[in-house]
Amino acid sequence: MHRDKLIEFINKALEVKIDKDPWLFNGLQVLGKSEVSKIALGVSPNLELFEQAATWGADMVILHHGLLGSKIAKPIGKVLGNRLKVLLNHEITLLTYHHFLDRHPVLGHNAQLI
């Protein structure tokens, strides 16, 4: 499936346009291949997860916690750089949806609690 159509579908399903999280950078964080056939899911953006996704052949990773955190620019150090390197070298698209996965009554992480 084309990456942009998939992102549009996910954004619509999670109702991303209804309200924006003012503190976190949600949605597309790293741009990868234009075609997506394998998607890895996770909670937090750690190096091991990205390496496993690359080994598995994932074209996209969808996470709860964002790699880039807030919209406030921060310096990229070695830890963040190594994570980005795996994604960029393997052309893996990274999507994150913190607030939207917390609150969605059907698709969210807290769906059983709501």
Whereabouts are the PLM-identified features?
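Hydrophobic structural segments
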Residues: 1-114
